Amino acid sequence: MKRILAIAFLFAFCFAVSAQQNFSAANAETKAQHDQRMRWWREARFGMFIHWGLYAVPAGEYNGKRSDRIGEWIMEWANIPRADYEKFALQFNPVSFNAKEWVRIAKEAGMKYIVITSKHHDGFAMYGSRVSKYDIVDATPYHRDPIKELAAEAKKQGLVFCFYYSILDWHYPAAYVDAPGKDPTAGNRTTKLKPGGKEEYLKYMKEQLRELVKGYDPGVLWFDGEWQDWWTEEDGKALYAYVRSLKPSIIINNRVGRGREGMKGLSKTDQTYAGDFGTPEQQIPPSGLPGVDWESCMTMNTTWGFKFYDDKWKSAEVITRNLIDIASKGGNYLLNVGPTAQGLIPAPSVERLAAVGAWMKMNGESIYGTTASPFASQLAFGRATSKPGKVYLHVFDWPGDGKLNVPAFGKDVKRAYFLTHPKTALTFHQVDPGGSLTLGLPSQALDPIATVVVLETK
């Protein structure tokens, strides 16, 4: 027994050392190289998240029961047996899916990249996988690869195509759910792996990731489901290195490893963790994260995967101001849609994205390629973003007296104007060099969501 334990310990130690060495090699890039790899993503600021899978079939209801929990977790919260859940594949026939239309909706909303679920926690692959028949091509009457169509269309329309991939897998044969029958509302049940199952599953996962990276050329791999106790930071570093070996320029989120703190999605700082950016979920860091790349992923209602009865929609104003708020703090906004089992993006999502797109068409310059607000604290009247030589003031609360008081930010202002009317100068008064200033504004805001004032600096 002692000999067996010693061998097991030696194997684990060697794996950890190898993982660290591979991670270090994959991460051996200069700051300039890292900045170049991250450049397009940092400039994009706005992307579409798509949660689409078998869970769209029950759409939040199983055996007449509904839940306020998220739709893509229905297999877990409804305690659906694996064999019964598999039957949803026979009903999954998204004949209304139109890749050109989906990408058009994203592009016209002002989004620059798309992240879609290639495999969520339920283990069902939304592409044609050679290592599993539990996919949309082989297991459904649809028999098409919508991911391939979407990737081609995204490239055609100029958007960067990206993948979500779940480390957690409720379907894989070597996995099983701890404490079956436990009340799901009491907390997420833990997925375990059978003896020897980890090595088997890692091989399977890496083969699927190779298919995705080599077959679809994604710009980002967005991992999730890393919280299981069998997944370690060493595993995360090894997987990060593996994916970067397949495509050195790819960007990978921090959920590949164990470096996030709950739903804050931020990288811990007690050691070097795997991943290129943090992932706050359903929240915006109050003061941003200076010096850290991050992306807030958020829903338009209360679910990621489609639920037919979830009508708690955020307004277009809230969504647009979220985008502005996130950009003002130096982050990206990954906004979710949950398509139906028929392959349609819900109408309320389409309507809101069109409204955001209308604002972005006029004001996108104040979002794309910007950096965080230059002000020491959050502005009372709205938010701000910046570029070399320019500061963009996003005015949410219009001053009733026609005077906008702007705090000092260490720069001399030489000109002020509305972004939508660049040839018409606004009056302003700046008492001291680099000091606070007062802008003269008309009685009514130009835009009810956010009027953008540009300050050109010396």
Segments (PLM) and residue ranges:
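Mature catalytic domains of secreted/periplasmic carbohydrate-active enzymes
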Residues: Q20-K458
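Bacterial N-terminal signal peptides
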Residues: A6-A16
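Positively charged n-region of N-terminal signal peptides that target proteins for export
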Residues: M1-I4, A106
